[in-house]
Regions:
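S-adenosylmethionine
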Residues: 183-186, 190-261
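N-terminal amphipathic/basic-hydrophobic helices that include classical n-h-c signal peptides
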Residues: 1-13, 244, 248, 258-259
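Residue-identity detector for threonine
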Residues: 20-21, 62, 69, 112, ...
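Conserved S-adenosyl-L-methionine
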Residues: 116-207
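Class I S-adenosyl-L-methionine
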Residues: 9-158
Length: 261
């Protein structure tokens, strides 16, 4: 399929990579298709690829407007992104590009500088008098995660945590998914309004305990890997349960949806 051709191209470009950033490749597509559409489609393509074949329908829908030459540029952008994250692990590659070219000041889309994220993480995790370590639940939550910078900062201190990000922006959710997945961090991302509890999309990022390969799984109302609609077609769903990974189960059934009492 075209997706596997894309994979082979990515591998080839990674072997022959230079210091060209992913944004430079996307800018070559922007005059024809628009910068916002190109960036959003790039994120969606990457998430589909990281879903390991479970999002073929959405993948082909996303690449439909582009010809072979343009898809080749997406391959180069993906390879450049992987190499950039390999050179600078646990550092957000999306926020600066998004804020410079695409953020909406009227919506308050200003991303927290990474230095401030590190300071917040140190303040939150600083030992306190009579502080007792929590057993079992080892999650860190950012209810307005943006591109996931605060979660990446927390991962620099402890990668073994489960990282949970919430954002009302679908684009921000995709950025966080990619940041968690390509840094091999277990976590969950929810496209939702954290104030009203309206939820549109849920994803799990799970790193296989044996192969150490991270994979993205979309979960909706207890159904794993259900083909999604495009972002514009999403309808709000009530938050009625908690999604939890289940250990020691076969891959097809390792996610449990627990209804609230």
């Amino acid at each position: 399929s075209i997706r596997f051709v894309l994979y082979s191209q990515i591998c080839r470009y990674m072997k022959n990579s230079d210091l060209t950033t992913y944004g430079e490749y996307l800018e070559k597509l922007s005059p024809k298709h628009g910068r916002e559409k190109v960036f959003n489609d790039f994120l969606q393509i990457v998430v589909c690829c990281l879903s390991m074949g479970r999002k073929e329908e959405l993948y082909f829908k996303t690449i439909k407007p582009y010809d072979k030459t343009e898809l080749d540029l997406f391959s180069q952008a993906f390879a450049a992104l992987v190499m950039q994250m390999d050179r600078q692990p646990l550092v957000d590659p999306f926020g600066d590009y998004f804020q410079e070219f695409l953020s909406n000041a009227q919506n308050g889309q200003f991303f927290t500088p990474f230095g401030v994220c590190e300071l917040m993480n140190q303040l939150i995790t600083a030992p306190k008098v009579n502080d007792q370590p929590k057993q079992g639940d080892r999650r860190v939550l950012d209810p307005a995660c943006g591109s996931g910078r605060l979660l990446l900062s927390a991962a620099q201190k402890d990668r073994a945590l489960t990282f949970v990000g919430i954002d009302i922006s679908y684009t921000c959710c995709l950025m966080t998914i990619i940041n968690l997945c390509l840094n091999s961090l277990n976590g969950e991302v929810l496209h939702m309004n954290a104030l009203t509890d309206q939820c549109w999309h849920r994803w799990l990022i799970i790193v296989d305990s044996v192969t150490k390969i991270p994979t993205v799984y979309e979960v909706e109302a207890g159904i794993i890997n259900q083909p999604p609609a495009c972002a514009d077609d999403l309808k709000p769903l009530p938050v009625t349960g908690i999604i939890q990974p289940v250990k020691n189960m076969i891959p097809a059934n390792f996610v449990r949806y627990t209804p609230k009492c």
